[in-house]
Amino acid sequence: MSQENSNVPALKRTESKYKIGRVKSLPTVQIDEKTGDSYIELAPRSEGKIYGCTTFQGNYKEEEKLGQGTFGEVYKGLHLQTQRKVAMKRIIVNQENDLFPITAQREITILKRLNHKNIIKLLEMVYDFPPESNNKDYAQFNQNNSANPPAVPKKFFYMILPYMVADLSGILHNPRIELKMADIKNMMKQILEGVNFIHCSKFMHRDIKTANLLIDHNGVLKLADFGLARQYYGSPPNIKFPGSAGSGAKYTSVVVTRWYRAPELVLGDKYYTTAVDIWGVGCVFAEFFEKKPILQGKTDIDQGHVIFKLMGTPDERTWELAKYLPGAELTKTEYKSTIDERFGKHLTPTGLSFLKGLLALDPYKRLTAMSAMKHPFFQEEPLAADRLTLPCEESHEADIKRYKEELHEAMSQKGPSAPPGHIKEATPSPAKFEKKSGIKREQPYQSNQKNDQYPIKRQKFNQNPSVPHPQPKANRYGGSSLPSGPKYGRYEGNNHSGSLRNRITPSNMGTHSNPRAENMGSKPYQSEGRYSSNEDRKNGYNRGYSSSVNSRYNNRAAFNETEDQSITTTTLNRYRHKGYHDNNQSQTRLQGHSSLPGKPTSKYNSTQTNIPYRRTEIPNPNEYNASKLGSQDTKKNDYPKHSETQKQQNNEEKKIHSEQKDIADLY
């Protein structure tokens, strides 16, 4: 009785606590006729759903397409319930009968097992139609029974990942983002922490590069794209040695993007270690300073030569086992290391030692992630920033093309400019000129009229426009008396050749007007006539300046009769081009011109074209007549002697003339 009574309450408690529902029928076990193995056949889930996957409808909304490549499309989306931005990565299945890709299977499995702040997190899997596809057209076809049915949409697998505002590749190519050494150290520490966690979890990433290093809006860096990652079976890494491949384990050597591929992979080693990821970290660290991949090989063989050009050809000291690898032929070409010259200007000796440790040729001498985090490089100033702060602008790898187009457009609209402050120091503004002498200088011309093509002050040449301009005096050959041609400098407005018969002689020298200035309403000015006697040399007239300089000067600084005419006239006469006349040849020759017949009558040799300027009292040029200009009574050495003060004034006036010439060239 006691036993029966004790069992009754127990049954009541069981009935009240547990509810028996509908029992699921077990699938029928079948036996394979060929192999004899037993198996069960699973029926597909209703509505085409996959276990562990959700759909876009009611859960996610696509916003824009971020990019497209060999991996497929990546969309920027929004989780409707939490309003959280996500990235939706499509997994490619090339053919209808293909199985689920092994790379995607590895990536999903590894991301489910890794949980670290510096590793991207897999939020969810989606199995649905592409976001941009429209299923309404296909539904209407079934209702209307149209003759031309639309293409049946295909479902794909999508990985739902957190949306990251930037990747390291986009940041390095963004011209508006400038990274400091404290920011670089902050990102390097985050990269090494993530890589160390992956290696200690007995995985190898095998695709470390700037495009796979993502950064969120809080400045947290995360490693992404584990499509090439895999598990290794050897011992995990420590402070000295990397994680080993394991006994008898052989891996494929065609991994890692070529420009970030370690030398042991280039030489065909299939028993590599976790050190292949450390080489990629070193390439990323060096890329901070050159803003581009540092080892850009065109082929797999060329990649080996590029590596050895930077680090030097391996020998018994740097990499003893390199000669036993399948691609050891590459090590026969002798190269010297250039890493010191290439990166020594960017890094301190400690930073250069850190880079060499990451890029050591021997994988067993290469730094591990654990030892790299303890390197003295992170203890010296400046220390790593506590938090990475970046501009609000999003920067992805897909934006690099846009950055290059913006730079090309800016360069096409803007001409090449000198460095800041260069133009200001070389050609200062005329208003800021230091007044070195009593000579009055003209101000630069600023016109509001569109037709003005030359910087000339109109009021300086013609204060009364009603006065007609005299025509230039014609010489006996019917042309202008102004000489031209490559031998005698540049004379605007003269179309005659530079023959000897068109040169100015004392008989045809007079007052002429510049045709270019005449078209602009300018006032006639005195010609570029050359004084041609030895007496002129005695009086100190300078013949060394080229005719083009005098033409530009007279166009810009012709004297103004309403102002101080004595100063302006003296200024003009000082900078006029002077020549001399040889009565024996009855022709005027330029001083020192070796191509003309006859010998120069001065003491300067034929190769000297610029005669030093000599200052003396200059009389009014209108007082010179032909007889005075043609006289040759003065001896060669009868030059006036000048004091040191006069020589100093001459040098100052030379500088002023050079400055005025530079201003004329600018306009």
UniProtKB/Swiss-Prot annotation:
InterPro entries: CDK, Kinase-like_dom_sf, Prot_kinase_dom, Protein_kinase_ATP_BS, Ser/Thr_kinase_AS
Record flagged with keyword Cell inner membrane: no
Record-linked PROSITE patterns: PROTEIN_KINASE_ATP, PROTEIN_KINASE_DOM, PROTEIN_KINASE_ST
ATP-binding recorded as keyword: yes
Alphabetical keyword list: ATP-binding, Kinase, Nucleotide-binding, Nucleus, Serine/threonine-protein kinase, Transferase
Gene3D superfamilies, alphabetized: Phosphorylase Kinase, domain 1 (3.30.200.20), Transferase(Phosphotransferase) domain 1 (1.10.510.10)
Active site (UniProt): D207 (proton acceptor)
Low complexity bias locations: 541-556
GO BP terms in the entry: positive regulation of transcription elongation by RNA polymerase II; transcription elongation by RNA polymerase II
Compartmental location: Nucleus
Residues the record lists as binding ATP: L66, G67, Q68, G69, T70, F71, G72, E73, V74, K89
Superkingdom assignment: Eukaryota
Family note: Belongs to the protein kinase superfamily. CMGC Ser/Thr protein kinase family. CDC2/CDKX subfamily.
Record function comment: Serine/threonine-protein kinase involved in transcription regulation. Phosphorylates the UBC2/RAD6 ubiquitin-conjugating enzyme (E2), leading to monoubiquitination of histone H2B and the silencing of telomeric-associated genes. Also required for histone H3 methylation. Necessary for the recovery from pheromone-induced growth arrest in the cell cycle G1 phase.
Protein name stated in the entry: Serine/threonine-protein kinase BUR1
Phylogenetic classification of the source organism: Eukaryota, Fungi, Dikarya, Ascomycota, Saccharomycotina
